[in-house]
Each structure stands twice: as structure tokens, then as C-alpha cells.
Amino acid sequence: MDRLQTALLVVLVLLAVALQATEAGPYGANMEDSVCCRDYVRYRLPLRVVKHFYWTSDSCPRPGVVLLTFRDKEICADPRVPWVKMILNKLSQ
């Protein structure tokens, strides 16, 4: 029984890590005007969950786009990745 519980715990921890989203947030010297992405989401988001997007500040050290979901989560994504480009194109139409 202990092995089953341990295996279940390991699976749940791995699932939590895999589903972890990188949320957008301000950081840096001028936190009021800049939103930067420290990291990008590691999994593909389906278009149906994204309602809006906005670009991160030009003062950020790396390019980023923040995808706003229908559940009002702000998720950082790499604008150079093909699936992100597709979402940006669809939402810009």
C-alpha cells in the first residue's frame, strides 16, 4: 500500500510541475510601468482559452507577450514560438 501512495504522490507532484504556468508580473526599477516575463510558459496553450494578449515593456531584458485567459490568468509566452505567433495572428484579426 505504501508503494501505491508513494507512486501517486510522485505522479501528483510531476503533474503540478508540468502544469505550472509562468505568470506575468512587474519587476525591475520602475515597477509601475513595466511588465516583464521572467520565464515563458513551457506548454502549448489552446487558442480557445486565450481571450486577449498584450506585449511586455520595451525595457524588459527579453521579449515577451502576456496571454490573458478566460479565467483571467496572465501567462507569459515567447513571441518567437510558432504556436504563440498563431494565437497572436488569430486574436489580431
Curated annotation (Swiss-Prot):
The keyword Signal applies. The N-terminal processed forms MDC(3-69), MDC(5-69) and MDC(7-69) are produced by proteolytic cleavage after secretion from monocyte derived dendrocytes. CDD domains: Chemokine_CC (cd00272). Its main location: secreted. It is found in: Secreted. Highly expressed in macrophage and in monocyte-derived dendritic cells, and thymus. Also found in lymph node, appendix, activated monocytes, resting and activated macrophages. Lower expression in lung and spleen. Very weak expression in small intestine. In lymph node expressed in a mature subset of Langerhans' cells (CD1a+ and CD83+). Expressed in Langerhans' cell histiocytosis but not in dermatopathic lymphadenopathy. Expressed in atopic dermatitis, allergic contact dermatitis skin, and psoriasis, in both the epidermis and dermis. SMART domains: SCY (SM00199). GO terms for cellular component: extracellular region; extracellular space. Pfam families: IL8. May play a role in the trafficking of activated/effector T-lymphocytes to inflammatory sites and other aspects of activated T-lymphocyte physiology. Chemotactic for monocytes, dendritic cells and natural killer cells. Mild chemoattractant for primary activated T-lymphocytes and a potent chemoattractant for chronically activated T-lymphocytes but has no chemoattractant activity for neutrophils, eosinophils, and resting T-lymphocytes. Binds to CCR4. Processed forms MDC(3-69), MDC(5-69) and MDC(7-69) seem not be active. Belongs to the intercrine beta (chemokine CC) family. PANTHER family: C-C MOTIF CHEMOKINE 22, SMALL INDUCIBLE CYTOKINE A. This is C-C motif chemokine 22. It comes from Homo sapiens.
